[in-house]
Amino acid sequence: MALSRLSSSSSSSNGSNLFNPFSAAFTLNRPISSDTTATLTIETSLPFTAHNCDPPSRSVTTSPSELLSFFRTMALMRRMEIAADSLYKANLIRGFCHLYDGQEAVAVGMEAGTTKKDCIITAYRDHCTFLGRGGTLLRVYAELMGRRDGCSKGKGGSMHFYKKDSGFYGGHGIVGAQVPLGCGLAFGQKYLKDESVTFALYGDGAANQGQLFEALNISALWDLPAILVCENNHYGMGTATWRSAKSPAYFKRGDYVPGLKVDGMDALAVKQACKFAKEHALKNGPIILEMDTYRYHGHSMSDPGSTYRTRDEISGVRQERDPIERVRKLLLSHDIATEKELKDTEKEVRKEVDEAIAKAKDSPMPDPSDLFSNVYVKGYGVEAFGVDRKEVRVTLP
């Protein structure tokens, strides 16, 4: 499969320091990497398919530092999820656990096309989205193991990661329920006029939920800056899209709402689509992005992932479309990094993950009294009365 067509230029780089915890780890020795103004123009591996709108350009502007950040961050995400699998099998992680390996390009590309003013809300496959928003490995593993240093203080677990200070409004365990909440965030953004948008992520398994269409309708009616992102990994639990949807072209599901189908295994295509969608949403209201992606693990830890699909199918996607390998090829073909440097990066990532796991194991368990905290939000002192204002009087939470 042809990866892309490449060209170099020397103009001001539009790549910002998107992944602060990771980008500092790279030192570049070749001529292209020593030029801070160097840019690359890369054509996406596949064209965008549009519904009720003109598609964005396939030519994406990037930089050596951004590509290196993509590689390292996706490698970190991949290793983080594989290690979580081992921890689950060792009974150090309990309950539900949904892994994201294979889909890393969506989380990384979305970060590259947004700012921390923008909001992201997603379903239960949320570990990598949290990490992309600036979360740390310690917070991830401590939460997965139910420890006090977790991002939700050990009380949320795998499905309920959260980082409000970076605009990440969490993973949510109820299928599709996060989409109306995301549209509510977009309502707040429009009310405050802060020129930001909300990305509400859901899977193909949630695409048939009624509340999704209700939220989309009100968002379109009020021109809210809401971007609905369907992460189509082709299987809702063990059900293939063709078995659950009469029309699996999810980017067209909005009818009167524009949509765009994106190669969700290409981080640069995701970046381009998210920038395009943000510009559209701020001017014209909601838009749907369908990310064509793939998960390597089963739906959850109880799913071997091979009863409803063949191992040949999984290995075929790995060979042809793996998001990390795509970026690796770009880095090597442009002489931005050597194979040894990339392998060294992967070794560093493995070490970081191991160190974070060790620290998370040392984190204390929540105090039993914490069971009763965060049950209700702090009251605003609002009072409710009965019909005659004497019958019933209560202070609302």
Swiss-Prot record:
Regulation (activators, inhibitors): E1 activity is regulated by phosphorylation (inactivation) and dephosphorylation (activation) of the alpha subunit.
Annotated residues for binding of Mg(2+): D204, N233, Y235
Reactions catalysed, as given in the entry: N(6)-[(R)-lipoyl]-L-lysyl-[protein] + pyruvate + H(+) = N(6)-[(R)-S(8)-acetyldihydrolipoyl]-L-lysyl-[protein] + CO2
The keyword Transmembrane is assigned to this record: no
UniProt-annotated binding residues for pyruvate: H98, Y124, R125, G173, V175, D204, G205, A206, N233, Y235
Any one of the GO BP annotations: pyruvate decarboxylation to acetyl-CoA
EC number: 1.2.4.1
Subunit record text: Tetramer of 2 alpha and 2 beta subunits.
Known role: The pyruvate dehydrogenase complex catalyzes the overall conversion of pyruvate to acetyl-CoA and CO(2). It contains multiple copies of three enzymatic components: pyruvate dehydrogenase (E1), dihydrolipoamide acetyltransferase (E2) and lipoamide dehydrogenase (E3).
Protein name: Pyruvate dehydrogenase E1 component subunit alpha, mitochondrial
